[in-house]
């Protein structure tokens, strides 16, 4: 009889959480080790694996924590609830809790790109022309977004308006950088972004973070170049070594030129020096040709 009662209790606990993947739960931290953190949800416990924890967060015993349910497993000992602090869905759910317009369906989060503990970008859309989606998420004096940032332990959040116009969406996704032009290359799935020289570092972001998040948010590869780089490419586009693209070096976060022929990548300064050398060589060749022509005429 006791065994049946226990089985019935386990079944009730499982049914309480079955199908709740994608929900947020609030629990109290019980214990932490190298593998996972245990959250007390009341009647059951939740597992927060190390892989689902934000690197910079330090769970403190008895502290309350919100987490995102990623899986509910049925085991012989009862339900095993696996939660996450790194899932992009956590950000979406936190905004639902803080923004009534999202909970009511007036404002939608159309896309979300996240690097946990560092930065998140969300694209929002309003189904009511009288409601500003960005303003609704930010709140009066930033009160709403501040609550989300606090729960995420200071993670930066960029809120941009969603747009069906791809160039416009890419431009907004690279906020806070100011973009001059976006060219869509359908064949390669690339958005070529042109920015003023002084905006290049901001558009790329620290270690390429802003560009990466913008690419994930839009679903397109984002190739950022300054006006000077574009001018140089167009000037030397017929030169073999000039064929390639600007990419972000994952180790330094700086832009480097990757030749199309698979050669070694070069820095922006080296690219400019090489372009100047090419220009000088062309000038010298032109001067020699003119001198030869003049000599021929004199003869």
Predicted regions, residues:
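RNA-contacting regions in translation and RNA-metabolism proteins
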Residues: 1-299
């Amino acid at each position: 009889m006791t065994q049946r009662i226990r089985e019935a209790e386990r079944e009730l606990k499982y049914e309480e959480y079955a199908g709740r993947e994608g929900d947020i739960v609030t629990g109290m931290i019980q214990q932490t080790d190298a593998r996972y953190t245990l959250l007390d949800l009341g009647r059951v416990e939740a597992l927060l694996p190390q892989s689902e924890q934000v690197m910079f967060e330090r769970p403190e015993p008895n502290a309350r924590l919100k987490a995102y349910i990623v899986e509910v497993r049925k085991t012989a000992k009862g339900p095993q609830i696996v939660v996450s602090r790194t899932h992009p869905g956590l950000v979406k759910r936190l905004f639902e809790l803080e923004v009534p317009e999202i909970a009511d369906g007036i404002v939608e989060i159309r896309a979300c790109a996240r690097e946990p503990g560092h930065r998140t970008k969300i694209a929002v859309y309003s189904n009511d022309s009288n409601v500003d989606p960005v303003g609704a998420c930010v709140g009066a004096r930033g009160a709403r977004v501040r609550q989300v940032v606090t729960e995420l332990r200071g993670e930066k959040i960029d809120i941009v308006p969603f747009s069906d116009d791809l160039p416009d969406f890419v431009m907004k996704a690279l906020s806070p950088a100011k973009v001059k032009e976006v060219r869509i290359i359908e064949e390669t799935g690339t958005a070529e972004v042109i920015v003023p020289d002084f905006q290049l570092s901001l558009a790329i972001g620290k270690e390429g973070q802003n560009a990466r998040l913008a690419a994930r948010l839009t679903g397109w590869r984002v190739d950022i170049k300054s006006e000077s780089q574009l001018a140089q490419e167009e000037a030397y586009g017929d030169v073999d070594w000039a064929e390639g693209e600007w990419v972000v070096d994952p180790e330094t976060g700086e832009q480097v030129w990757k030749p199309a022929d698979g050669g070694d990548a070069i820095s922006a300064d080296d690219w400019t020096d090489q372009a100047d050398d090419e220009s000088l060589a062309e000038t010298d060749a032109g001067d020699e040709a003119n001198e030869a022509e003049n000599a021929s005429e004199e003869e």
